[in-house]
């Protein structure tokens, strides 16, 4: 596995750089198909927590929950009861229960699931709510969903092996009313697939990639829930190659896509998609990229302080040398110190845990990089 620089507590992350997070405590074992969610701080807590739920290795499916306290930089095995073992499920946090984590779908060694369960982090208990309306058929899921407000949107997913479910209906679960529905959509939906990413930005849902059998897709689709019309987008720029089992997040006007698998191996690339300009950019990094991986999980976390660039680091070094010589010009003072507002700002990081390569090596590392 490639060695990345370590981002220590209190460090300012540099732009265009991948880091490893080293955390103490009861960390999860290596796994794939887990979910990764960030919960903001509650009560007197200064920083939020990352929740790693479920997953699998070649021998078993997991029903455990591990957390990272971003204030203490410690792992904790959040002993909980009631979660059915599952991997390649999805996790989401609806607006109506902002401090609870819901999971849907996935599988264990006995087959696919289509049930919903809810974690109360305070009591560390899972419940299985009674829902109404026709649910999607059991399916592996993972990144094939996205939530907007109280609603989870489901499209596609895996049925058996490399074959997706043949259903191209958009399924909607309302966490407030505990109801499944299948709204009428317009336009041509994406073809059946699994291992695609589905991410929400505003009122739009974006779907990229995935596979069916040995066919890897590189297309990008969008549906706006305000008019329920499917569109196949034709973006410009350096688009990702056909891939599956990758990850995606939305930050402001951008989508970020990382990793995945192709017919030739696992990817370690990250792409940025500008939603308004419909333009792809392959991001370049100053250091070596992380090990290529698939079936990992990714979320956005806040990191205290602003990030720096190589140019800013160089300027800071020059200022420090000038200060040692007694040069306290206005320029030097301004460049040498952060304002109080800057020091209190947070940098957003893409946080990635686990996954595997196409040779079967499974990972248990935490890697991060700053995003705009």
From Swiss-Prot:
Pfam families reported in the protein's UniProt record: Kelch_KLHDC2_KLHL20_DRC7
Basic and acidic residues compositional bias, start-end: 321-330
Quaternary structure (record): Interacts with PIKFYVE; the interaction recruits RABEPK to the endosomal membrane. Interacts with RAB9 in its GTP-bound conformation.
Swiss-Prot/TrEMBL Kelch repeat ranges: 49-95, 100-146, 151-203, 204-250, 254-303, 349-372
Biological role: Rab9 effector required for endosome to trans-Golgi network (TGN) transport.
The protein, known as: Rab9 effector protein with kelch motifs
InterPro entries: Kelch-typ_b-propeller, Rab9_kelch_effector
SUPFAM superfamilies according to UniProt: Kelch motif
Residue segments, region Disordered: 309-341
Main location: cytoplasm
Record-annotated membrane-spanning stretches: none
Maturation and modification: Phosphorylated on Ser residues by PIKFYVE.
Alphabetically ordered keywords of this record: Cytoplasm, Endosome, Kelch repeat, Membrane, Phosphoprotein, Repeat
Location(s) in or outside the cell: Cytoplasm; Endosome membrane
Annotated organism of origin: Bos taurus (Bovine)
GO cellular component, one term: endosome membrane
């Amino acid at each position: 596995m490639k060695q990345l620089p370590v981002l220590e507590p209190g460090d300012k992350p540099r732009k265009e750089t991948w880091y490893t997070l080293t955390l103490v405590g009861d960390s999860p074992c290596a796994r794939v198909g887990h979910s990764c969610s960030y919960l903001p701080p509650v009560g007197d807590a200064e920083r939020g927590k990352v929740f790693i739920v479920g997953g699998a290795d070649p021998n078993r499916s997991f029903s455990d929950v591990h957390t990272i306290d971003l204030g203490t930089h410690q792992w904790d095995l959040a002993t909980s009861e009631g979660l059915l073992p599952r991997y390649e499920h999805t996790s989401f946090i609806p607006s109506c229960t902002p401090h609870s984590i819901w999971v849907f779908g996935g599988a264990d060694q006995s087959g696919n699931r289509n049930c919903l369960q809810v974690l109360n982090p305070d009591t560390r208990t899972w419940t299985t709510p009674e829902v109404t309306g026709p649910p999607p058929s059991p399916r592996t899921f993972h990144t094939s969903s996205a939530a907007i407000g109280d609603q989870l949107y489901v499209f596609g997913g895996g049925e058996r092996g490399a074959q997706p479910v043949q259903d191209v209906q958009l399924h909607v679960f309302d966490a407030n009313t505990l109801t499944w529905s299948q709204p009428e959509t317009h336009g041509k939906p994406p073809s059946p697939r699994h291992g695609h990413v589905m991410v929400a930005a505003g009122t739009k849902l974006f779907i990229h990639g995935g596979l069916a059998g040995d066919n890897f897709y590189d297309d990008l689709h969008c549906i706006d829930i305000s008019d329920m019309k499917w569109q196949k987008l034709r973006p410009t720029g350096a688009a990702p190659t056909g891939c599956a089992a990758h990850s995606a997040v939305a930050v402001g006007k951008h989508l970020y896509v990382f990793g995945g698998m192709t017919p030739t191996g696992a990817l370690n690339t990250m792409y940025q998609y500008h939603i308004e300009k419909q333009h792809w950019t392959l991001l370049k990094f100053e250091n070596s990229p992380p090990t290529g991986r698939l079936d990992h999980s990714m979320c956005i976390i806040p990191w205290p302080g602003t990030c720096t660039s190589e140019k800013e680091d160089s300027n800071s070094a020059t200022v420090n040398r000038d200060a040692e010589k007694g040069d306290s010009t206005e320029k030097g003072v301004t460049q040498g110190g952060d304002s109080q507002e800057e020091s209190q700002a947070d940098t957003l990081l893409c946080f990635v845990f686990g996954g595997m390569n196409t040779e079967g090596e499974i990972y248990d590392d935490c890697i991060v990089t700053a995003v705009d």
